[in-house]
Structure formats: C-alpha cells, structure tokens
Amino acid sequence: MRSSNPVLGRAFNQRGFASMNPGATIQHDAPADSPQKLEDLYSAPSASSLRTGRMTIDDVVTRTGILFGVLVVVGGAAWTLNLGPAFLMIGFLGGFVLAMVNSFSKTVRPALMITYAGFEGLALGTLSHYYEGAYPGIVSQAVLATLAAFVGVLFAYRSGKIRVTPKFTRVMMGAMIGYLVLGLVSMIGSFAGVGNGMGLYGVSGLGLLLAIGGVALASFFLILDFDQIQKGINAGAPEQESWRAAFGLMVTLVWLYLEVLRLISILRSSD
C-alpha cells in the first residue's frame, strides 16, 4: 500500500500489517460453517486495540484529542500572556523541526508529537492574539470556518463523493509543490518590500487568489489524511501508529487554520 501523505507514508507504506495475530476472540475448534462457529461470531464482543493490538478509529480520535488538548492549553496560555514575536518564532521553528523529525522517523514517538503540539500551541496562541487585536472576532471566525471545512470534507469523503485515486494524489502533490514554490517566492519578495512587506499576499487580487488556493489545498489534503487512516486500519496497522495518524491530521488542520486566518484577514482588510 502506497501513501502520498509525507507524515503517514513511512508507516502505512509498509506491508504485512494484516498478518499480525490479533489474538483469538472466538472458538476455533468448530468447523468454519458450523452453528457453533456462527454463534461465536455473533456473540463475540467488538474487537478493540487492547485486544487486537491493531489501530482503530477510536484510537486515532483519542490521540487526536490529546494532541489538540495540549495545543489548546498552551495556546490559551500564550494568548493570555500576550507573548511577543520571539515566542512566535520559537513556536514555529520548534514545531517545524519536530514536524520533520516525526514525519521521517521510523519509530513512533508520542512524547515528541505531544511536544510538537505544545510548540504549535505557543505559535498559534501568540499569532492568533495578534490577529485578534488587528481584526476583532477573526479568531472565532477562523476556528468555525476550519471546523466547517473539516466536517464538510469528512462528509464528502465518507459519502464517497470524493475518492482518492492515483491521479487525484498526483494532482495534489503537484499542487503542493507549486504552492511551496509560490510561498518561497512570496517570502523573498516580502524582504524586497513587495506587497508592503507581505510578499505576494499583499498584492491586491493576487493575494486573495493565493489565500483561497491555500485553503482549498489544505482542505483537499484532509481527504488524503482520511484515506490513509482508513487504509492503515484496513491493513491492520499497529495500535501505536494511531499516534502518527493523529499527528498527521493535526499538521493538516493547523495548516488549514493558518490559511483560513490569512484569507479572512485579507477579506477584512479590503473592507
């Protein structure tokens, strides 16, 4: 099974998860089609990760909740303390380093993923406080818009309206590369004073289009996350991999929130 997600890929590209022995939950001494066998199948309790050793959707939800709990607590503290730009840089740089370590590590390290959530909380809390001061109410708008996008994309994926195909994956990865190149050009331009120091995002019209494209791209990457989580569960990925799945989901949601925050700020600054 191949994964396009750079966070989930190293774990879920492995083969052989399904060959794990989850442990017996029913009797196996009866013929496969015997009444006793069927009765055991119906009466057996639902398998959990504690009994099978495999990742379940409940595991992913629980780990995601833990990571976002840490992010919210640290972010709330950073917001309350009204920390300066230095802490914003520490948060983003620390988060970037840990994102790279966790993404390319073959070993799942929950402690590093929780630490990543803390750094992101520091960065997002500080940045959100700044945006809230410039555009009152923007943070609640961005949070609600991010949640709405998450729910909408999840519904579209679960209903089968959007399917992950090799072509879809190639298009998304190509779009990501293009977006990263534009981001680099924008950053270089900001140093040269383009867009009043905001780079391409400060250029009227173009900045709005880039922001909309960023929100759309981050939303579509949620689909890749959902697909890889489902494939990991179907392949019998180890329970520990639920941490990696939760981490990958958090990375995309943080990216989506930042893109939404930037889009709303551009829209409100043009009023």
Predicted regions and their residues:
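A hydrophobic alpha-helical transmembrane-helix feature that marks the membrane cores
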Residues: 1-271
